[in-house]
Amino acid sequence: MILFKQATYFISLFATVSCGCLTQLYENAFFRGGDVASMYTPNAQYCQMRCTFHPRCLLFSFLPASSINDMEKRFGCFLKDSVTGTLPKVHRTGAVSGHSLKQCGHQISACHRDIYKGVDMRGVNFNVSKVSSVEECQKRCTSNIRCQFFSYATQTFHKAEYRNNCLLKYSPGGTPTAIKVLSNVESGFSLKPCALSEIGCHMNIFQHLAFSDVDVARVLTPDAFVCRTICTYHPNCLFFTFYTNVWKIESQRNVCLLKTSESGTPSSSTPQENTISGYSLLTCKRTLPEPCHSKIYPGVDFGGEELNVTFVKGVNVCQETCTKMIRCQFFTYSLLPEDCKEEKCKCFLRLSMDGSPTRIAYGTQGSSGYSLRLCNTGDNSVCTTKTSTRIVGGTNSSWGEWPWQVSLQVKLTAQRHLCGGSLIGHQWVLTAAHCFDGLPLQDVWRIYSGILNLSDITKDTPFSQIKEIIIHQNYKVSEGNHDIALIKLQAPLNYTEFQKPICLPSKGDTSTIYTNCWVTGWGFSKEKGEIQNILQKVNIPLVTNEECQKRYQDYKITQRMVCAGYKEGGKDACKGDSGGPLVCKHNGMWRLVGITSWGEGCARREQPGVYTKVAEYMDWILEKTQSSDGKAQMQSPA
């Protein structure tokens, strides 16, 4: 009988990778050796997903029901590690093997929508109800805070009293404790990892408060935000308590306790200095954080098993080196004199059994962080390269199509959308300076990100507040020059599928010929119109500055501007789109080329829109967004 290690690990968010994305599945092949965990999964794809999120798994092998006579080994999923990144393959009829997708960017997802017919996924049955379809059963599971997977007996199930029964289930490891072939039964998983739960979530972090109840895991993390992300992707964590690095008990400092309860909420909480508590974000709708953490922690050392030590120039290069190395989970970059040669210093690449540091030390001459290979972008830049494919003549956008787009709203006696903007970093938004004409007070502004429909915004919708408005020093009201401003948010944003930064162009990027450009916003659909509810998009060609100058003979079109529009008109940005993005796709990457600034009317014939040219302001953007430790806080692929 095979021994399955249920719940002896939890999903790590900062896992190792091999170099390059390998998606090939090997039929009739089984990897020999290297086992780090085993479980039951309904197919090879789900087994691969579990491998992708496991801290040590690089390879997997799966045994379908048809591949083996031993009932206890059917649907067996074996997760494997290897120092070299590969293992010997042996022939096994029906077996399927493959690689982790940690290195595969946008293919990284914990969402699994498939329905499996003719199988019963076993676990702890905690809720039974009558429903009319398997889809309704899956929806109930998704809307139940404890449900991980389900089974549904169809109308043709052999026992009439069980027909249309929907069984909600969970297990210690989040996967079935057994899978049995059973006619007229359909099974599947909760869609909470798809950000489709209707439960709602608590995004607040509670300072100096400790939650009670059952601990399901304990890890070391540098801050409460890493703790929360780990909780979000742990199969049984519903809330957490984090003990800071100044907690009174030294052995408990930086401990992140992942917790659960029967009710789904803490049964009690206790005021405690230097503790921080919060909730899993798995039940958030459309706002799940990415399963990675990009922040670098200066003055901090991460301890763990040593993989390699190499000399590199700068902490960012150290993080990139960790990200590219086959098994690196986290790193420390040392600035000790004895660890440096000329301009390069030692980069310590490390790993652990659970993907988290085994020790965290403060007040050092090092900087530490995590591998970025579970970031969905799939490259060293956090800014996104993905979309699905004041807008006049535009069409409706879809969820996640333009994840950098934000709505700048003003709340005085009433609240209204005023301008657009572009997310360029965890704490930075780029927009037009003229949006703040007459409204320079930061307290009246609310920044909404990760939204599609303005009508979805209610008094309970989370928003960002402004910490600082930075308007270009040469901007003058009622003039079109230097129409650019930065917004620093009071708190950093988590990146999600619907909320990611746009890449910035290279400094002085004037030679690139862009042919696939889009403008987005909620602005008027005609000159004398009204704000649109659904985010609009329009594909629009760039116009040379020489041609643009001919159309605006009473104005000066400078090299710091870029124009776009159709000669015949009909499609353009308009009122309410100001500050929003003009983005262009080049070599597979979206870049913020312009900021919606001004124009003569909206979509008029031979009157192109004028945009602030972002490439001409890269020095200014870098200067203003540079942090105290010298790490740029916006996202640029250059």
Curated annotation (Swiss-Prot):
Question: Which key words tag this protein in UniProt?
Answer: Blood coagulation, Disease variant, Disulfide bond, Fibrinolysis, Glycoprotein, Hemostasis, Hydrolase, Inflammatory response, Protease, Repeat, Secreted, Serine protease, Signal, Zymogen
Among its keywords, does the record have Methyltransferase?
Answer: no
Record's keyword annotation contains Protease: yes
In what tissue types does this protein appear? Found in plasma (at protein level).
UniProt GO MF annotations: serine-type endopeptidase activity
**Peptidase S1 domain sequence ranges:** 391-626
The name on file for this protein is: Plasma kallikrein
Native organism is: Homo sapiens (Human)
